[in-house]
Amino acid sequence: MGSKSPEGHRQAPHASNCNELKPANPDPQISQNGSGSADLDRGVIGDDDDDEDAEENGVNTETPNVGKLNQPPFPNLDQVHVTTTDGLCITEKKKKRKKSNKKKKKTKSGALPATELKQTSPPRVLVSTLFPSEYPVGELVPYDCTARTTDEELRYNSRLWDDDFLPDYRQAAEIHRQVRQYAQKELIKPGATLLSIAEGIEDGVRALSGHQGLEPGDFFKAGMGFPTGLCLNHIAAHWTPNPREKDVILDKGDVLKVDFGVHVNGRIVDSAFTVAFDDKYDNLLTAVREATNTGIKHAGVDARMSDIGAAIQEVMESYEVEIDGKVFPVKAIRNITGHDILRYHIHGGKQIPFIKNNNQDKMEEGEVYAIETFGSTGRGFLDDDVGVYGYGRNENMSGANLRLSSAKSLLKTIDASFGSIVFSRRYLERLGVKNYLLGMKNLIDNGIVECYSPLVDVKGSYTAQFEHTILLHSGGKEVISRGDDY
């Protein structure tokens, strides 16, 4: 989810291989490729399974000893010739192995063990059930200036991050991967309504996290990190379907940005991708994807925001795209930025512009960042559009002086159900809240709630976005949201 700069306040990359990095809380048994290696991570495939298969095919899995018959497999013969230790050759009937009729053991509840489970479509199996011990690690990228992570650095990281930090983030990332990959395969198709896509994504996140967010306090345990952004063409960011608005239907000529967040105990994973069905947009998507990967490459402890922004702009603006016979330069959008992420706050205090700038802020060890870029065939500058994307609570403002009863009641619901996490009108109505517009206006007028509008470039232009969340370890960065798709 892009952060507005102070001035303005089906193409996917393959993850690259990298050297192994020792993270703050090392999990050496876990795959670095996310859900793509889930079966191996959960132990579905292993040496024991190979032995059992061999035995079923008549293969002797024991090591031959002196004095024993050497019995190679002969699956199509009734007799085998064997040689004893004294040199005699004899013929024996091949013994037939009885087929095992053992049934798979079930749990007390009658279900198959967790190691036998697969994700469903639509995704409804809890990620915590699929990964009962540890969650997959993101892509680990060591810093160029270090060869190893010292024990002292590991102890320092352990003080920065509590014991739940990495498990929470990795669980949120795995939920994001599984839901978005389902969306890419089953939901995002020409003719689909944007409302059906948004609801499909959000239903998947709630199902895999195990928290529907309908009871007071449940939303704070896990769920959506912010409303699903579904932005078409010149709409770059912050658009989501609202209740009782006309359905928007996805067309095969559209360029769709999909941006959603997942949180577990307030640890928010923010990741986005762009989908286009017409290959004439390929260069636009490639430019933005490569710019995001460039930002990730340059990110790290002590990296300056100015240097990252300059590198992003250089890569993105080296591309041009031909659309319907006209050539457009790809421009880095200059008044929206990447950002750091704090607990229960999608936007922290630091920003990463996509252009060359004078921001001398540095990244620090233990921080979490959303590295994202937006590219456009238009002006490369965004304006607020009509409509509402969502709302965010201003924690610095008290509601003690509110006079309107509807505003007081609505604020109580917001504090109990969302806290500082951005929410949409659909989320309010899902809780059964009605007639809230007047109360919401009063909260906005008093500075207690901030309203977010869609951000657009000029009509007729096309915009694209790619984004990943990274964690800054001592010896390297973990691209926590990296997957096989991008």
Swiss-Prot record:
GO cellular component: cytoplasm
Residues binding a divalent metal cation 1, per UniProt: D259, D270, E467
Biased composition annotated in UniProt, kind: Basic residues: 93-108
Keyword DNA damage found: no
The organism's place on the tree of life at top rank: Eukaryota
Skewed-composition ranges (Basic and acidic residues): 1-10
Molecular function per GO: aminopeptidase activity; initiator methionyl aminopeptidase activity; metal ion binding; metalloaminopeptidase activity; metalloexopeptidase activity
UniProt region (Disordered), positions on chain: 1-120
Family matches, as Pfam families: Peptidase_M24
PROSITE patterns found in the cross-reference section: MAP_2 (PS01202)
Name of the top EC class for this enzyme: hydrolase
Keywords, comma-separated and alphabetical: Aminopeptidase, Cytoplasm, Hydrolase, Metal-binding, Protease
Feature: compositional bias, Acidic residues: 46-56
Subcellular location: Cytoplasm
Keyword NAD: no
Catalytic activity: Release of N-terminal amino acids, preferentially methionine, from peptides and arylamides
Main subcellular localisation: cytoplasm
E.C. numbers: 3.4.11.18
Cofactor(s), by name: Co(2+); Zn(2+); Mn(2+); Fe(2+)
Functional description taken from the UniProt entry: Cotranslationally removes the N-terminal methionine from nascent proteins. The N-terminal methionine is often cleaved when the second residue in the primary sequence is small and uncharged (Met-Ala-, Cys, Gly, Pro, Ser, Thr, or Val).
Family recorded in the similarity comment: Belongs to the peptidase M24A family. Methionine aminopeptidase eukaryotic type 2 subfamily.
Protein's name in the database: Methionine aminopeptidase 2-2
